[in-house]
Amino acid sequence: MSTTIKPILLLADSQLLFWRDEEGLPFLQRARTLMEEDDPGKAFKAAYLGASNGDASEFYELFLAAMGEIGIRDCRHVKASPSSEDRQFLEQADLILLAGGDIDRGWQAFEASGIQQKLIERYYAGALLIGISAGAVQLGLKGWNEESRQLFDTLRLVPFVVDAHDEPSWARLSQIVPKAGEHTKGVGIPSGAGAVYHPDFSMEPVRHPLVEISQTEEGVRQALLFPGETHEVEGAAEQVARPRVVSPEEAISLAMGALTPEDDKVN
């Protein structure tokens, strides 16, 4: 499996899963092309994480249809409480999609299962990550509880706070960015749009303009980022998460735990 770090696809909703550009090419073909560059001819595996929507089967069916459009047939719905088979598939997945839904609900499930650390590891091992709505938020710096608006750290693989389909005012993101830490920026992705975040810390809007929100001395500032242009993300290197370094002792402990049958483990 390739270890080339790939772009992250951030989608406001599922529209881009089936959208075709002016030349008639599926947007998701970009994902297929990126994987083919490293492993031409491989039968790719695609994992769907539906914890944020309560593992609703109808959204997984949409995922299967989208993967079929780009010729990926080996797919699996990795549940909020993943089985050993789910974990094994995720370890081998070339493409991983974080579904939309409730940001906090999904994040709590990721933390409870340890999936959040595995996603960071898979990203740095070369898997291509896609986040839709809540999933896109979880790939960024901060998530929040919808009722209390309490902030919490998320995967931090994308060096800004993400929000989706809250246009035109982006009031929620405008309130969150000043609370998220000094120099933190936010990116709002409107309905039907997306963003491609590249490993060189640049970002590419897709289909519709994005809104970048930052805190200045004069207050909250909004700027439009247009498709067809590449935008540098300032301070990205200091913001993004890095793979966790495991000590030799911890590696042995994890390996021994993996070899222990589930029925023999102490609850």
Model regions: which residues?
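Structural alpha-helical scaffold elements that stabilize or flank donor/cofactor-binding regions
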Residues: 88-89, 154
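Short helix-loop-beta junction
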Residues: 62-75
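Class I SAM-dependent methyltransferase SAM-binding "motif I" and its flanking Rossmann-like core
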Residues: 105-111, 115-172
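C-terminal and late-domain segments of enzyme folds
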Residues: 2-41, 50, 54-61, 65, ...
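A short, well-structured beta->alpha microelement
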Residues: 73-87
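Conserved acidic residues
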Residues: 44, 94, 159
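Structural motif
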Residues: 10, 95-99, 130-131, 161-162
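A short, aliphatic-rich alpha-helical micro-motif
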Residues: 90-91, 123
